[in-house]
Design a protein with these regions (language model features):
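Conserved class I S-adenosyl-L-methionine
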Residues: 1-34, 36-45
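Class I SAM-dependent methyltransferase SAM/SAH-binding core
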Residues: 46-88
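A short acidic, Gly/Pro-enriched loop at the edge of an enzyme's catalytic core
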Residues: 87-98
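A short glycine-rich, Lys/Arg-flanked "PGG" loop and its adjoining helix->strand segment in the class I
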Residues: 113-125
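Conserved beta-strand signature within the Rossmann-like core of class I S-adenosyl-L-methionine
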Residues: 126-133
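Acceptor-substrate binding/catalytic loop of class I
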Residues: 139-154
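Conserved S-adenosyl-L-methionine
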Residues: 164-175
Length: 192
């Protein structure tokens, strides 16, 4: 459902999100990574964050389930973007960090424990995992997209058997203009 939306609206989504300033979120993530870390941008969307990480000198591998968004992102960042879902993605090497900004929220709640465990298997020991969800404890379908909202308690349930431990959570307002009344749960997780 959500993939079809992004395939049909890739250019509009790219235009609406590529200039959103998420540096305040990245500033909680990047200082905790080794120099020249390899980051997985999981569900990279427009490629905005991949491009920023590359500009910071990090190695970045990106994927998205939407083939149209992946093509737009690949053009934007100047390197390939793999087309696959979270649980389809595999890689020969482990990552220092995983960045899943506003992407895991499209995974049904029933599949998130397995999805977190799969992604955790791609991290190096003590690897860092950032994720963000619309804040709440419910699921909804809106504008042709499925959303899994998440609060602190729900996140703990999703990661309980994943090999990840919670380092910190914080709430923010939506960074896109006109959405200041929407709240997000941000989390930093560590692989045990």
């Amino acid at each position: 459902m959500s993939v079809n939306y992004y395939n049909q609206n890739a250019q509009a989504f790219f235009a609406a999100t590529k200039d959103v300033d998420v540096s305040s979120l990245m500033s909680r993530f990047t200082p905790n990574l080794p120099a020249q870390a390899h980051i997985l941008d999981a569900g990279c969307g427009s490629g905005r964050d991949s491009k920023a990480f590359l500009a910071m000198g990090f190695a970045v591998t990106s994927f998205d389930a939407s083939h149209e968004l992946a093509a737009v992102a690949a053009n934007y960042i100047g390197q390939p973007v793999q087309v696959c879902t979270f649980t389809e993605f595999t890689h020969a090497q482990s990552f220092d960090g995983i960045w899943a900004c506003a992407s895991l929220l499209h995974v049904p709640a029933s599949q998130l424990p397995h999805t977190f465990a799969h992604l955790a298997s791609l991290l190096k020991p003590q690897g860092l995992f950032y994720c963000s969800f619309k804040y709440g404890a419910h699921d909804e379908v809106r504008d042709g997209r499925a959303f899994t909202h998440c609060d602190e308690e729900r996140l703990q349930r999703f990661i309980a058997h994943s090999g990840l431990v919670l380092r910190e959570t914080w709430k923010t307002t939506d960074l896109r203009p006109g959405r200041e009344n929407e709240y997000w749960l941000n989390a930093l997780l560590i692989k045990e």
